[in-house]
Amino acid sequence: MARINDHFLKLKAGYLFPEIARRVQAFAAAHPEAQIIKMGIGDVTEPLPEACRTAMIRAVEEMGERATFRGYGPEQGYEWLRQAIARHDFQARGCDIDASEIFISDGSKCDCGNILDILGHDNTIAITDPVYPVYVDTNVMAGHTGPANERGEYEGLVYLPLTAENHFTASLPQQKVDVIYLCFPNNPTGAVATREHLQAWVDYARAHNSLILFDAAYEAYITEPGIPHSIYEIPGARECAIEFRSFSKTAGFTGTRCAFTVVPKSLRGQAADGSWVDLWSLWYRRQSTKFNGVAYIVQRGAEAVYSEAGQVQVRALVQFYLENARIIREQLATAGIQAYGGVNAPYVWVKAPEGLSSWEFFDKLLHTCHVVGTPGSGFGSAGEGYLRLSAFNSRANVEEAMRRIVSVFGS
């Protein structure tokens, strides 16, 4: 019989979101009359922008004609999409990023896990706490950690707490680490990093030959001036950082699937013999070997994001969710509940009232308000006592959910 990958057995029982689903299903079965509003998983609800839909329909028609039919595309994605990304998302912000350094993929979640294929097994890895669970679980699956302790922390990982006291932006590690996961605007806390904070991380990485894996999936939600949208706005980042981006939350592509990863050609890693190897070549080899690219139709839809009409429609979509976040924040304040985030991100990080634990707060919201959030402890031990609410929902659902919460907690 074939041997399994035993590292999977180290994963904590049940991924966070399946456990949420289990509890919600049990409650719904016991209370079929309850109108449950789900504000947990960050999936979008509003339609694709018209510019994207029109471009995709046109691409479908092209696929129906021999003269314009497309088969396998380029390993990195079509150049016209990569050029649009480089021009609008990076060069327009003064970032020295070329289209050849951009790799189109079907999701930043996939890329955040797949990037481990080109990294060694003996790196010291730092993650923030709380953190997007994918960063941790993919390292566990790859054998980069030991078992989890009673707090759910894995042996071998360096945890950097995000707290209200440090404004949910982690302090630099006291020791040398090789790989650093950063996500700003942050999931789950909704916090952002200032230019000075990111410069400190870049300086640390360059001083210690560390690699920053920078998740910028929510950069379109930044509203405050002066907050960097890309790690490459920081001098020196080309020599120490890989950036992950996605069209999922920017343009509603969660069901359409398109994202991209930026690997500068000046970025180097060290081989076992001490020689320096450029990571661009390794990632190109990995992608061309294991990935067949994103559908032509989808890439045309993504390209339309950068059209004049697409930019207007995407900004309106983002603003819709940010308005939801504002409603959530302000209504929680009315109920006397402390909350963070929701200004530069679609997530609101809610402090559990009355000394409740994360899961106790989750259960109380579910049972008394019929509202589903995401327990903060599911993102790490430092998330205990918090709960994440997502602004990805209809306006009617958000307003009704907050009405219920105010009626229960505001009395």
From Swiss-Prot:
Top enzyme class: transferase
Keyword S-adenosyl-L-methionine: no
Keyword terms of this UniProt record: Aminotransferase, Pyridoxal phosphate, Transferase
Cofactor requirements of the protein: pyridoxal 5'-phosphate
Catalytic activity: (2S,6S)-2,6-diaminopimelate + 2-oxoglutarate = (S)-2,3,4,5-tetrahydrodipicolinate + L-glutamate + H2O + H(+)
A GO molecular-function descriptor: L,L-diaminopimelate aminotransferase activity
Example of a GO biological process term: lysine biosynthetic process via diaminopimelate, diaminopimelate-aminotransferase pathway
Residues that coordinate or bind pyridoxal 5'-phosphate: Y72, S108, K109, Y132, N187, Y218, S246, F247, S248, R257, N292
Residue positions, PTM N6-(pyridoxal phosphate)lysine: K249
EC number(s) recorded for this UniProt protein: 2.6.1.83
Task performed by this protein: Involved in the synthesis of meso-diaminopimelate (m-DAP or DL-DAP), required for both lysine and peptidoglycan biosynthesis. Catalyzes the direct conversion of tetrahydrodipicolinate to LL-diaminopimelate.
Quaternary structure annotation from Swiss-Prot or TrEMBL: Homodimer.
Family: Belongs to the class-I pyridoxal-phosphate-dependent aminotransferase family. LL-diaminopimelate aminotransferase subfamily.
Protein name listed in UniProt: LL-diaminopimelate aminotransferase
